[in-house]
Amino acid sequence: MLRRTLLASAAAFAGLTGAAVAQDDPLKVGFVYVGPVGDGGWTYEHHQGLLAVEEHFGDAVETVFVESVPEGPDAERVMTQMALEGADLIFTTSFGYMDPTINVAAQFPDVRFEHATGFKTADNVSNYSARFYEGRAVQGHIAGQMTESNIIGYIASFPIPEVIRGINSAYLHAKEVNPDVEFKIIWAYTWFDPAKEAEAANTLIEQGADFILQHTDSTAPQAAAEAANEAGATVYTFGQASDMIEFAPAPRVSSIIDNWAPYYIDRTQAVIDGSWETVSTWDGMDTGMVEIGEITDAVPAEIKASAEEMIAAITAGDYHPFTGPINRQDGSAWLADGETAADYGNEGIAGMNFYVEGLTAEVPQ
């Protein structure tokens, strides 16, 4: 029978470094979530990965998870408890879990840790993320052509490179097809807070936005747009992190789907067979870690076709969303004509902390 618990009672713990797990000894895999599993977005999709691990491995694994864990000291406490209770592999699924993950991993050298969206590693800590900015390019391409008000609203979470990259990518591709487009950005300073997210969406709609993009985790912006449409407005959205298909065909006209399941299965298998090692993974459409949800018929056929061409080009590696010429917001050159951005280094997108030319807001400091 498949074994799964929220937090099991204390159990004996045996180190597994460099050795495969015995066939009759289930591997205990833990997941730490920043939101509830029912958030409909970020955490929901990570939990789908957990369920895929269970389905793939059956009785060979036991999974545990804790949801709605704040970033900071609480996260460190939860990770410590998981390790003490026998977890062999722990996935920590929010950027703000980075330092807690490193701290706890140092205390449990025989436990493997996998941290999502961060950049630090250790002998027993890997990190992984997805190239969400690829999906943002598609969203900008669609929104820029469909907007009637020329105002696109963006609900941002925290001013970290991952979020700034997404804003820049969406803006560049909206501007490419619509030189008159304007982005209005609201920083929510939260990953998951439906009330704040709804308030941000409503504010943007009041400011004239007829497209709402989000880098927050709940479906509240979708519901806010739906309510606005019922009141006579025309507002469109994109599902974030998960398909959010319940809001299709409108306001949700497509989505970015984070597909973590293959990665979770692969890393779990590596621990089982003794081949786990520290890696940094940053995958995108090419591997299927980033997927684009169905583009609905609310999108005109010619726009849908051009968006699908962009998806195919990014997936094949024929197009990079950050291809020059691109200037920084202050007008200084960043990428020359035809030059594609590096991942790392002083000019790389991994540490992106600036807006591109044309965005009028300021990056919060």
Question: What kind of feature is each model-predicted range?
Answer:
Residues 2-7:
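N-terminal export leaders
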Residues 17-22:
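Sec/Tat signal peptide C-region and signal peptidase I cleavage site
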Residues 23-365:
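A residue-level marker of the well-folded mature domains of exported/periplasmic proteins
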Residues 8-15:
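Bacterial N-terminal signal peptides
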